From Swiss-Prot:
GO molecular function: glutamate-5-semialdehyde dehydrogenase activity; NADP binding
Origin species: Hydrogenovibrio crunogenus (strain DSM 25203 / XCL-2) (Thiomicrospira crunogena)
Primary subcellular site in the record, as a coarse category: cytoplasm
Superkingdom to which the source organism belongs: Bacteria
EC number: 1.2.1.41
Entries under SUPFAM superfamilies matching the protein: ALDH-like
Pathway involvement of the protein, from the record: Amino-acid biosynthesis; L-proline biosynthesis; L-glutamate 5-semialdehyde from L-glutamate: step 2/2
One Pfam family, short name: Aldedh
CDD domains named in the record: ALDH_F18-19_ProA-GPR
Name of this chain's protein: Gamma-glutamyl phosphate reductase
Annotated localization: Cytoplasm
Amino acid sequence: MDVKAYMQKLGQQAREASRQLMVATTRQKNTALLNIATALEEQAETLKTENAKDLEQGKANGLDAAMLDRLALTDKVINGMATGLRQIAALNDPIGEISDMNYLPSGIQVGKMRVPLGVVGIIYESRPNVTIDAAALCLKSGNAALLRGGSEAAYSNRALAKCIQSALHESGLLPTAVQVVETTDRAAVGEMIAMPEYVDVIIPRGGKGLIERISEGAKVPVIKHLDGICHVYIDDDADADKATRVAFNAKTHRYGVCNAMETLLIADSRAAEILPGLVELYEEKGVELRGCEQTRAICDMKAATEEDWATEYLAPILSIKVVDDVDEAIDHITQYSSGHTESIITENLTTSRQFLARVDSSSVMVNASTRFADGFEYGLGAEIGISTDKFHARGPVGLEGLTSQKYIVLGDGTIRE
């Protein structure tokens, strides 16, 4: 196969479809989403049959149990995807929204209109449900989608693509509005991220290695986050019960997610009071603790190294550091944070405002678990990922994050004097 020619063709078709989607009505887009949901339910047995081929191949290739679990399309997963599509259909459509309309002395009206980005390329690993999530968010926001899933889910993704494209056709939209890259040749990724004439933005979802490779080679903007080194700081003026509850949840609610706490910071004045009980809870849960010298003087645990402060564990491991005050906590966060999510536990309004203003992460919280850093929890309905960059989107990327804006100017034969 000529991979370059294949990707160019997909890109051309996506660009053409994006022009139709740009002016599609909310009703058309919602109908398409609902039709995809119905197609998934009607084709559930076919989807499971194709998915079984991926699972069989995955076992032969030595994929571990966790990976196979993420790969599986069960009835529950398929029903969940259909439900998600219907939920996205129920969300407000951001496209065409007009804001900040002002009359100016020159006689013109100037405002902003929300518009799609165009063609969104999404590169991801393992989970075939991302195919549906990505397609749904792109369609609702008026974008064409070019999807490149992992080779381990090739059969599943092709089957899902058939459901999507038949539903698009039935809805009066171009089936090429959502295309799955069917070749497993890795050269396809290199071509996909180097087609600025056809692709407007790339969103990689997967491990750090994948995201770094995409970022380094892309010739189009990339929406991404590399790490989730999240912190919780227990302040001098923290409520002890709140501190214990939040710090425990932020670490133990789920380990392998980017918004789990990886480092706990605690003010020296509160360490001896709060740490013993909290450490006992962590140990009962099976969390391995690594502490600074002051922490280890209070509770017995492994010594933390310099590397620990800069590590996203994605595992039941936690680093703990005692700091003098909020200034030292912020300095530590500034040095080691990945810019994802940080939280302060305090009853002091002045300190909380200082923390909110000075901590430069995509989500900054007061008296809340870092586990809330999620598009659904933020009321966005769904998310395509989380961005720790400052352009174009930051934080959980929902429908609005997949849009841009243009200025609109209204006159009445108005000329510039």
